[in-house]
Amino acid sequence: MDKKISILAFGGSLRKGSYNKALLRAAQEMVPKDAQMEVFDIAGIPAFNQDLENNPPQIVKEFKAKIKAADAILIATPEYNYSIPGFLKNAIDSASRPYGDNAFDGKPVAFMGASIG
């Protein structure tokens, strides 16, 4: 049997009733049989600190390892003040550091979002 395509997904909202978390759950149900999608909760990733980038907290190590192991990345995020939420930017910064060890290198990344408006 061929290896399934691995998709790592995460959301850009901390809100319990997040529309974007619901969007990820819906996307997970629509994943084709030749793929699998894991949703990673980035809420516990601490503020990026460059002094710790060579030995980051365990959750950052786990996040980076999952990104590196995935074939593709899916991010569902709301728009806050014409941009992405700060904690999502923080998670992306944490996974792309230190220089030369960017977990996203070579990964296709898709963004999607949902809102009531």
Which sequence ranges carry the predicted segments?
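Short, flexible hinge/linker loops that cap or flank conserved catalytic cores
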Residues: 1-2, 103
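Short glycine-/acidic-enriched loop or helix-start segments at secondary-structure transitions
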Residues: 19-21, 49, 84-86
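N-terminal beta-loop-helix "entrance" segment that forms/cooperates
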Residues: 39-59
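N-terminal beta1-alpha1 ligand-phosphate binding loop
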Residues: 2-34
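Short hydrophobic segments within beta-strands
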Residues: 10-11, 40, 112
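Helix-loop-strand module that forms the ligand-binding subsite of alpha/beta enzymes
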Residues: 56-117
